Every structure is written in structure tokens, then in C-alpha cells.
Amino acid sequence: MKTKFLIPLILFIGLVVFLAIGLNRDPHEVPSPLINKAAPAFEIPQLADGSKMFSPANMKGQVWVLNVWASWCVACREEHPVLVELAKSQMAPVIGLDYKDKREDALAMLAKQGNPYLLSAFDGNGRVGIDYGVYGVPETYIIDKAGVIRFKHIGPLTMNLLNQKIYPMLTELKKS
């Protein structure tokens, strides 16, 4: 008779513990198997000039920021002023990856809101995004001088995140 009540009680307590652990985690800090691994290689056309190609190999020897965005993404529009601020800081080059978008829509958005990117690569079919494990846009990566991903953030950047995490990390990575 006691076992009849004990098993559901243990299951209930286990479920509560599991849910409590999940609630204490930051939803933007999704573990990525790419952290501390070489950034996936690719070569795709640039957004502004489709005859020019971009590859992460072009950035070897530099600490840089890769921001995955799209013109149809509301959160990307929300984070846009923060990216402009990051670009103005000149802490690191900011490269855009225009993800599953229409070239003309992306160019129109950048013309209207300002272009924080040194350049944007055009990933119209989303294949590069798949290699990077993109959950959704926006996503931001910090890549070190050796081409290794050191940080991934899912969701829009904020000024607080820039000041608390990104600027200090860029400063530290530039030293090494």
C-alpha cells in the first residue's frame, strides 16, 4: 500500500526538480557543440555584390563577430541599433550572414536602418546556417584569430550584453 503512494511521490519530486533546474537556465545560453571548435568553412556570395565571395578564411588572424540576421526577422530589427554601436566601437569587424532572405529585402533594410557590417554574406538557402547550428535569427558568434568559435548568443544583442560579455571577451581575445 505504501509503495502505491511512494512511486508517484518520487516521480512527482523528480519532475519538480527537473523543471526547477530548467527554469534557472538562461534561454539564450544554449550549449553549442561548436564552442572552442573551428568555425565551419564556407564560401558564398556577398550580399551587396554577388560577384564577390566571402569565406571565414578571409578573416584569419583577426578576432571578428559573425551576426546571423534577416530582413524578415523582427528581433533583428530590434538588435540593429546595438550592432551599429558594436561596429562604431571598432572592437572587431562585424560580418553579417543574411539568412534565408531575399537579397533585395535585405539591401533595402540596410539602406533604411544603416549598415553595421563590414560586409554581409548571402545565405539565401540557409545551408551555412545549418552548418553553424542556427536555431533562429538573430544569432551572434565571436570567432578568434585562429578561426575558432569562442562565443555564441541566440537572440537579439543588448547594450548590457555588449558591455558585460562581448566587449570584455573581444578585448581578451585580441590580446592573445
Per-region residue spans from a language model:
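N-terminal targeting signals for export/organelle localization
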Residues: M1-P45, S176
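Thiol/disulfide oxidoreductase modules built on the thioredoxin-like
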Residues: F5, A111-P116, D123-K174
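Short pre-active-site segment immediately N-terminal to redox-active cysteine/selenocysteine motifs
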Residues: A38, Q62-W64, V68-W72, G136
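Conserved Rossmann-like nucleotide-binding pocket used by diverse enzymes
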Residues: P40-E43, W69, I95, I130
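A short beta-strand-turn-helix
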Residues: F42-V65
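Hydrophobic beta-strand core positions in alpha/beta domains
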Residues: V65-N67, G96, I142
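Structural microenvironment flanking redox-active thiols in thiol-disulfide oxidoreductases
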Residues: R77-G114, G124-I130
